[in-house]
């Protein structure tokens, strides 16, 4: 999450404070460099000293995601990362996730946006009533397969219906 009344910069450096301090003292030049780098990568324009709550929901989402990148995580676990964001911001988030995965890292994505899953994922696990309804490989992923599995429709049940 974000600390909405705090600045964009404060939110971006919060998870990295331990790495940006030495002997209990904050390294302001390192903090400023990190903020400038992340703001550039996120395409956040304007003053990073303004409150994060002044950003659009999509830009807030980019800050919430990007603040973890300096920690060099091997896994990102995301829940509906593009819900409620505009198309351009969604594209930027997709680019960030693809770049992360291209570095050999794992992105685990829970999403109610079926086209997003088709567009981003190389594997999809569909849950229905708390159980795995389908595990789809890249060549099996389609909106129909995902929705069908979520609704309990399988090849066997389709044959019974015919």
What residue spans do the PLM features occupy?
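Glycine-rich phosphate-binding loops of nucleotide-dependent enzymes
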Residues: 1-162
């Amino acid at each position: 999450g974000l600390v909405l009344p705090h600045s964009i910069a404060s939110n971006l450096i919060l998870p990295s404070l331990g790495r940006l301090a030495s002997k209990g003292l904050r390294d302001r030049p390192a903090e400023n460099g990190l903020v400038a780098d992340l703001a550039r990568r996120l395409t956040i324009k304007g003053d990073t000293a303004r409150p994060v709550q002044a950003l659009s929901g999509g830009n807030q989402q980019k800050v919430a995601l990007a603040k973890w990148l300096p920690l060099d995580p091997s896994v990102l676990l995301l829940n509906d990362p593009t819900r409620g964001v505009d198309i351009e911001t969604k594209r930027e988030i997709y680019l960030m996730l693809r770049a992360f995965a291209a570095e050999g890292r794992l992105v685990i994505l829970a999403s109610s946006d079926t086209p997003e899953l088709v567009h981003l994922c190389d594997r999809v696990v569909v849950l229905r009533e708390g159980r795995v309804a389908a595990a789809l490989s890249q060549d099996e992923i389609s909106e129909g397969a995902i929705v069908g599995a979520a609704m309990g429709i399988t090849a066997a049940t389709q044959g019974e219906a015919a």
